Amino acid sequence: MLNVHYFFDPMCGWCYGASSLVGVLADIPEFEIIYHPGGMIPKQAIDPSFRQHILQADAQIANMTKAHFGDAYKARVTGTEDYIVDSYSTTRAFLVGQEMGIEAHVMLAAIQKAHYQDGQHLDELNVLADLAVSMGLDKATWNEKMADSEAKMRSQVQESHDLMGQLQVSGYPTFILEKEDRLMRLPHSNYYGKTEEWKNYLAEWV
């Protein structure tokens, strides 16, 4: 079994662009993904002047990765209402989803779709609860676990930051392969939008 350390954030656009690469990696039984959430954006309203930059970056991501950004999401970014982004609540949901039996890559992809395609307000805990229910999870259990998830989330984010410092990781997404006591950064950006080539590349390590 080969470990791949994945440094990411649920609200990172390039991580959304890399979601198909994560899916390929998760489907190869010889690899185990170790997820390191980064807590990129504490809950905050994005300044209107920065929204145009987001749209430009999204266009670049879509062009390079073939990821789809939905109309509902774009309407939120360009709208007159506050556009609130929260890495912490979505990371809590990511962790609780796994605790309740959802595979990590499936939970992450569902959160990313809800944000980047469906334009849902994932800073609101009731919206995250509805997402959990749509994935077959019990709402009462979900709410109970979410209420207790803050400390674990902050601990995981701090561990991620510590490891990022040790490994000189400066951004998301980053994939680092651990093999025979060696750590190697995988050139994932060479394979954006090229899942078959990515699969063939990964097979060389097995």
Give the location of each predicted region.
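Extreme N-terminal starter segment of soluble prokaryotic enzymes
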Residues: 1-5
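Short metal-coordination and nucleic-acid-contact micro-motifs, chiefly zinc-binding Cys/His arrays
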Residues: 8
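C-terminal cap of thioredoxin/glutaredoxin-like
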Residues: 11, 19-25, 113-206
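Structural alpha/beta surface segment adjacent to cysteine/selenocysteine redox centers
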Residues: 16-116
